Amino acid sequence: NLASATIDLKEYGTTNHIINNNFNKSFDDYVVALKHNLNLDNNFMPKNKNLINGKVDIIEFTLYNVVGNDIQMTKRESDGSITKQTYANKLGVMTTPNGTIIKSATIYSKIGFELRGYLKDTLYVYKDGSVDVVDK
């Protein structure tokens, strides 16, 4: 998730607010890092199947920006659809799906894949995580 933590430097320089205004770049950076970290090809298939047994699915990628006390959410679902929504007065109250309280710009992602077990059995598993983008 940290690879996708791109911020608007002009906004930060003039207002000291951390805002991520380029959702597409953040998602693209996330995809590059995911492929590299999990050793995936361009079709999200593992280059070796020792542990991950098939395609890695991006279930959700969500960017939360904080503007005053409001949270602006941009979410990409597994089918590629994008949802944008603003939640008024939710700073410090709203959480990501994995329970992280949103206090600053935050990125959440969830992936799913088939995991090869010890006796060659397989199980579809999910992994999710959140990262806060802060200046301290």
Residue ranges of each PLM-predicted region?
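Short, conserved structural patches
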Residues: 4-136
